A protein has these predicted regions:
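Solvent-exposed loop segments that connect transmembrane elements
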Residues: 2-10, 49-66, 111-131
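Face-selective signature of the C-terminal outer-membrane beta-barrel domain
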Residues: 29, 33-44, 71-226
Length: 226
């Protein structure tokens, strides 16, 4: 038997990445008290364009796929803490309050599939099929608070037991929103054939009852809060 691939594609990818990071920490000491404030921030953005061309042997069709998107990631983490020594190292209290935020965004992902029209000889001869736009926004918030207490019992030089106690609390919240829209190319008055330039397909001028119908394609997991 001779194995045959299911598909054979060649991809051309253009990618641009920008990053921004910041770190800010400080501490303050006075007497038996020490305070610390720690901060971390990161921002990452990626713009990408993919052009795929090849053959799908399942359908025995030559296809093209075009995808344009931007993704953004934001991360912040901050902590404020304190340590307090009381009564000549007999009692000690420390506490920490923290907050963290993370988000992921895809403000406008565009996807276009094209199929070769074997009966059309002039260029362009790929006709657009199933364009789609996708939006998503994910946000995570978390806050925490911890406190510890330590007491040393001065019984003798050979025996000095220590009592420790503490509390910890945490709160987390997540929201996710996503929307996807499909384009029904049922009307006329626009060019369905394109050669890697799909700006006309997504143009607002082409969205009408007699040209391109824009419909939302919902899913059960598109939006949730936890």
């Amino acid at each position: 038997d001779v194995s045959r691939p299911r598909f054979e594609y060649n991809d051309i990818r253009y990618r641009n990445t920008s990053k921004l990071g910041a770190l800010f920490n400080w501490s303050f000491m006075k007497g038996g008290n020490k305070y610390e404030f720690r901060n971390f921030f990161s921002q990452r953005g990626v713009s990408a364009l993919t052009q795929r061309e090849g053959t799908n042997y399942y359908s025995d069709k030559d296809i093209r796929k075009w995808e344009s998107l931007y993704t953004g990631r934001t991360t912040y983490s901050g902590q404020l803490s304190g340590t307090h020594t009381l009564r000549e190292n007999i009692d000690k209290v420390d506490w920490t309050a923290g907050y963290a935020f993370a988000s992921y965004r895809e403000p406008d992902r565009k996807i276009v599939n094209s199929i070769l029209d074997e009966n059309k000889t002039e260029q362009p001869n790929y006709y657009v099929s199933d364009p789609m736009r996708y939006y998503q926004d994910l946000k995570d918030h978390s806050a925490s608070l911890a406190a510890n207490y330590e007491h040393k019992f001065a019984v003798s030089d050979m025996f000095a037991p220590v009592f420790n106690g503490g509390i910890y609390g945490e709160y987390k919240d997540r929201t996710f929103d996503a929307r996807r829209f499909g384009y029904n190319l049922l009307g006329t008055g626009y060019d369905r054939y394109a050669d890697w330039d799909y700006t006309g397909i997504f143009s607002d001028d082409n969205i009408s009852a007699d040209r391109i119908w824009m419909r939302e394609v919902p899913k059960n997991n598109d939006s949730y809060t936890s």
